[in-house]
């Protein structure tokens, strides 16, 4: 069962030298070709901002009672209504919030989506849209999220050169 309430407030969030630490996730889905290689076609899931004027990847504050990977998973569930395998970190970015004028540390992770939920905590606040990578790069509001997407594309392109073995533990599935 999924909790249909998002965490709110900043009292239990992590800070480093005055910078709020936020964690984001790039939900994606792959296609595996018949010869066992990963197709270069994959899509990423973007969400609308709460006010609906911008597109981005799920992200939010990293809470004191969770690991960074747990935070990435929670944000994807709360904001985009997806669950899956959180993979190795894409990187850390320091950025300035245009609206608040404060600095943040942003950690980004890829998530191979295993399930899209029909009900999720912020479904009435946000839209979710599957896009091709180029479309998402153009649509995404934040430069640091675009850079994280480029890291993911590079990582997955390296995987696509290698045929999949049946006993490999890579969390790759075909959802097309």
Swiss-Prot record:
Expressed in roots, stems and inflorescences. A motif (Nudix box) lies at residues 60-81. Mg(2+) binds at residues 75, 79. It comes from the Eukaryota. Keywords: Hydrolase, Magnesium, Manganese, Metal-binding, Mitochondrion, Transit peptide. It is found in: Mitochondrion. Its cofactor is Mg(2+); Mn(2+). It is an enzyme of class 3 (hydrolase). It holds the Pfam family NUDIX. Residues 1-21 form a transit peptide. GO terms for cellular component: mitochondrion. Residues 22-153 form the Nudix hydrolase domain. One of its GO terms (molecular function) is pyrophosphatase activity. Its EC number is 3.6.1.-. Its main location: mitochondrion. Probably mediates the hydrolysis of some nucleoside diphosphate derivatives. Belongs to the Nudix hydrolase family. This is Nudix hydrolase 18, mitochondrial.
